[in-house]
UniProtKB/Swiss-Prot annotation:
A Pfam family annotated for this UniProt entry: CTLH_Armc9
Protein name according to UniProt: WD repeat-containing protein 91
Gene: WDR91
Residues where Phosphoserine is found: S221, S253, S258
Bias-annotated ranges (Basic and acidic residues): 297-308
Biased composition (Low complexity): 230-243
Taxonomic lineage from the root: Eukaryota, Metazoa, Chordata, Craniata, Vertebrata
Length: 712
């Protein structure tokens, strides 16, 4: 309806201009329609537009003749002659103002009819109507519709997210139900007989009598293998059991009695049960205060004990011929452990442990980038989350995208060894590459060429770390003297004592636009190699980790060290600001993952021990004693968008831990897996709707895992 109103207004406006003989306005209005509307159409519609324009001008000429305004007709040809004289369809129309009765002329009679005029108006109206319906709405006018559509898509995504997690919980429940029959079948011999379940209702003397008979039976049985050493012997009769404690202790007693029955291989367990029954009966008759009902109950208990011993002995006897030697394997039913309830997996076993009932992330997919053929050193996502830059030990740089498909955008091989890599912040098409010969190169990933190469320092040729300020105006560069140990050693020598690779170094600030050095930071107490650097969100703070185990926090407005403290025994391998930027996290050569308060120098917030495959040095073993050892160079950990979870390296893939807990060990939430070689660097991009985890390993493989976060 809105489109029809607009079309009606356009047609009415054209007719009004013709009625007042405003040829200039008519031409301008049609030119406006051509520029704003008709120019967006395909070329196949150009003949139609030209015919409509010709008919519009003829309609104007006919109107001037019908209203006896020949002067306006002559004015039309005077102004339009240069445009129309070369067009064949206008060749006969130049005589129109001079004909006495043009409506009777066979050439023009059709145009003076009412039918032709109505047909033209309807054709113009229909053409504009179809054009408005098919033409895309301008972006500014489509804002409200886009907002509504975006909100609708977000609501649908949230509904699908909840359905996905609900299905995951249902799958977990069904798997648990499938495992229960197997567990019950495996634990059938641990089922408590009635006399044990009712033991808490027996008197103290009855309980002591049952326990004494059990001990007597165990004392007469020879010990079998290591299993007997694991069964403690009771030295005194237990006291009356409370109702709350009855079932667990009763179950333990049942297990011990079963093992005791199993140990009597050379004797008939039936006779032992009969002796027990006689003993129970004798004690029952000798007690003057017992009732007849209590005596019958004890006799029933004796029968049940007899059945229990008989069943246990017969089952073990079936297994006995298969065993070789005196140390026969006991019945599996007797030592089957019940399945423990689901618990959180601790750091001691990130690959094992139970599955959490509700995972914080769902793995939507995992892809592999395999265009590197040697160990990866760095793998970083740009700030837009669309491209990845990866660098291996052979100096091969790959820039590739993964959305919607994985595709290599640029590739380069460096003649000199490369040690560091960093994306530029403002112009995210640029890469900073630090070499092992004292140079930093600025590489354009779209033009696929080096823009410039600057010489940092000849005395300190190793560019260990690069960090670009978030404002894009500058970057810091860590230069160090030659290493005491090689970066990648194929003979795998002894790594030596921690912190032995302490060499002099410098921390420099460079201008991004001019590519000139601005200043050199002071490194107290002495110049030392800086292994890792990181800015906060606005670039006002810079945190560094050095080979001497010291973390230094620099004020980038004053260009001085605000505080420093010894953080690790050995080198600091990786350091990052926390999500709220009130603390920093670090990983060191000592295998510690520590959180530090930046408002109080050296104040430790938390400390955790990480596995060696998460901190390095990383070792890849091969045939004939071949070993490849790589010292950490890239980022060893990365955070999610809210800083609640951390991604680290491992021998088989990335591992995600939950942060902020009160436990003394980190809680492992998800193991990404997928690698056959140790992972040496990670990155976590949250620029897109779904999180993207990157894990790069020593065999040159890079795994890209897409995660969907569970929103509470």
């Amino acid at each position: 309806m809105i489109f029809h109103c607009e079309v009606d207004k356009i047609v009415d406006q054209l007719q009004q201009l013709m009625q007042v003989y405003d040829l200039a306005a008519l031409r301008d209005y049609w030119s406006y329609l051509e520029r704003r509307l008709f120019s967006r159409l395909e070329d196949i519609y150009r003949p139609t537009i030209h015919k409509l324009k010709t008919s519009l001008f003829r309609f104007y000429l006919v109107y001037t003749i019908q209203t006896n305004r020949n002067d306006k007709a002559q004015e039309f040809f005077a102004k339009q002659a240069t445009e129309l004289q070369n067009q064949a369809e206008w060749k006969d129309w130049f005589v129109l103002p001079f004909l006495p009765s043009p409506d009777t002329n066979p050439t023009f009679a059709t145009y003076f009819s009412r039918q032709w005029a109505d047909t033209f108006i309807v054709s113009l109206h229909n053409f504009l109507s179809v054009l408005f319906q098919c033409m895309p709405v301008p972006v500014i006018l489509n804002f409200d519709a886009e907002c509504r559509r975006t909100n609708q898509v977000q609501e649908e995504n949230e509904v699908l997210r909840q359905k996905l997690f609900a299905l995951q919980a249902e799958i977990h429940r069904l798997k648990k139900e499938e495992q229960q029959p197997e567990e019950e079948e495996a634990l059938v011999q641990h089922k408590l007989p009635p006399y044990v379940s009712n033991m808490d209702r027996l008197g103290d003397s009855e309980l002591a009598m049952v326990c004494s008979q059990r001990n007597a039976s165990l004392s007469q049985s020879p010990r079998v293998g290591f299993l007997s050493s694991l069964l403690p012997q009771s030295k005194k009769s237990p006291s009356r059991l409370s109702p709350a404690q009855g079932p667990p202790q009763a179950q333990s007693s049942a297990k011990k009695e079963s093992f005791g029955g199993q140990g009597t291989k050379g004797k008939d367990p039936t006779s032992g049960a009969k002796d027990g029954k006689g003993l129970l009966s004798g004690l029952a008759t000798g007690e003057s205060g017992w009732s007849q009902h209590r005596q019958r109950r004890l006799q029933d208990h004796g029968k049940e004990r007899k059945e229990l011993f008989s069943t246990t002995t017969s089952q073990c006897a079936e297994k006995k011929p298969e065993a070789s030697g005196p140390e026969a394997e006991p019945c599996p039913e007797l030592h089957t452990e019940p399945v423990e309830p689901l618990t959180r997996t601790s750091l001691a076993g990130p690959e094992g442990g139970g599955v959490r009932p509700e995972q914080p992330f769902i793995v939507l997919g995992q892809e592999e980038y395999g265009e590197h053929h040697s160990s990866i050193m760095h793998c970083r996502v740009d700030c837009s989350g669309r491209r990845v830059a990866s660098l291996d030990v052979d100096g091969v740089i790959k820039v590739w995208s993964f959305n919607p498909i994985m595709q290599t955008k640029a590739s380069s091989i460096s003649k000199s060894p490369l040690l560091s890599l960093e994306w530029a912040t403002k112009r995210d098409r640029l890469l900073l590459l630090g070499s092992g010969v004292g140079t930093v190169r600025l590489y354009d990933t779209e033009a696929k060429k080096n823009l410039c190469e600057i010489n940092i320092n000849d005395d300190m040729p190793r560019i260990l770390s690069l960090a670009c300020s978030p404002n894009g105006a500058s970057f810091v560069c860590s230069a160090a003297a030659p290493s005491l140990t090689s970066q990648v050693d194929f003979s795998a020598p002894d790594i030596g004592s921690k912190g032995m690779n302490q060499v002099p170094g410098r921390l420099l600030l460079w201008d991004t636009k001019t590519m000139k050095q601005q200043l050199q930071f002071s490194l107290d107490p002495e110049p030392i190699a800086i292994n890792c650097t990181a800015f906060n969100h606005n670039g006002n703070l810079l945190v560094t980790g050095a080979a001497d185990g010291v973390i230094r926090l620099f004020d980038m407005q004053q260009h001085e060290c605000a505080m420093s403290w010894r953080a690790h025994y050995g080198e600091v391998y990786s350091v990052e600001f926390s999500y709220d930027e009130n603390t920093v996290y670090s990983i060191g050569e000592d295998g510690k993952f520590i959180q530090w308060n930046i408002h109080k120098s050296g104040l430790k917030v938390s400390e955790y021990s990480l596995p060696s495959d998460a901190t390095g040095p990383f070792v890849l073993s091969g045939y004939s004693g071949y070993k490849q050892v790589q010292v950490p160079r890239g980022r060893l950990f990365a955070f999610d968008s809210e800083g609640n979870y951390m991604l680290t390296c491992s021998a088989t893939g990335g591992v995600i831990y939950k942060l902020g807990g009160d436990e003394k060990v980190l809680e492992s939430c998800l193991s990404l897996g997928g690698h056959r070689a140790p992972v040496v660097t990670v990155d976590w991009s949250t620029a897109m709707d779904c999180g993207t985890c990157l894990t790069a390993s020593m065999d040159g493989k890079i795994k890209l895992t897409t995660l969907l976060a569970h929103k509470a």
